[in-house]
């Protein structure tokens, strides 16, 4: 239904108008009695195999929605009903920001990608708090912050379940800026200090760019080992335009911006795998970038991600993508459980045969008992020299060497 009816309608609009229409529709559904229940009935998948506990937080499933879709926290409860295990709102700034001039978001249908230079367009801290005050027990809401990190952290601390520090955002630091260890710690240390004085613990994640050199990725991974940082979100969009099917003329006309979607899949998985390997698999990773299919999701998890986030794949494939990923993960878990059960059953079935074979082997190794008629003769016989005596020559009453 999404691909045949809804997607053509949405794709006939500019991407920002389509996005706004979806948020308005979701909020309207949420106001209808039973509206969110109907969404859950159609799209949500619940299964114990999907449940995760990451940085001390329990997630109903590992599939989340990346920052940028619900920038102001307007529809996170309706998005939860669509099957997401968590939603990251933002990017949030202290004051409302209009962002960059339009047009600023572009679809690349031939590549299943989007180019975005929207900037930090959001309605500001106060409006976000107003939305996050709505009850959301049992559902995880993260908050993505760029610039003025400490102010946002303090004001949103009681409303969000975790925080993402978005150092990869071009709007909080100049494009191509080098993210040295000192630069990152200047951002993080005040947040750690504030958190130490609170009664509740809020995990802090660091979001990285796929365009960072591997050496910088390694240095950021090492920060996990040296600080109270809880994990990494990998990755943001890329400025790379290599290998696209969209014409160079079209790309030049669009201009600058971060590319997300299918062209990012391979690099995002590489970055996640590198961080996982470098950190010894001991720290949480949220994998995001180019997850367009259930197979992409499984590849990201296999690379070391603990949780996933969707964005562009959700736009191109619709709400059924979350359901399809969750179903695929459940099917894999059930298949693995069935294999383990079959292996255990086979081992149990083979156990009597193994025990019988062992008993027979033991019996063969036992010395043959001597008959009563031969015992006296054996007792009167000259004992064989110790070095040449064999088990066959030793009767049950023969003296055995100490073991």
Where are the regions a protein language model picked out?
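Glycine-rich phosphate-binding active-site loops on the catalytic face of alpha/beta enzymes
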Residues: 88-94, 167-169, 231-239, 291, ...
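Glycine/Thr-rich beta-alpha phosphate-binding loop at enzyme active sites
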Residues: 36-45, 170-183, 223-281
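Short beta-strand/loop segments at the ligand-binding rim of alpha/beta enzyme cores
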Residues: 58-64, 137-143, 197-212, 277-287
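Catalytic cores of alpha/beta
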Residues: 74-79, 212-226, 281, 291-308
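N-terminal capping/small domains of soluble enzymes
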Residues: 1-141, 146, 325
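Alpha-helix-loop-beta-strand connector modules within alpha/beta enzyme cores
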Residues: 113-116, 122-138, 180-201, 253-283, ...
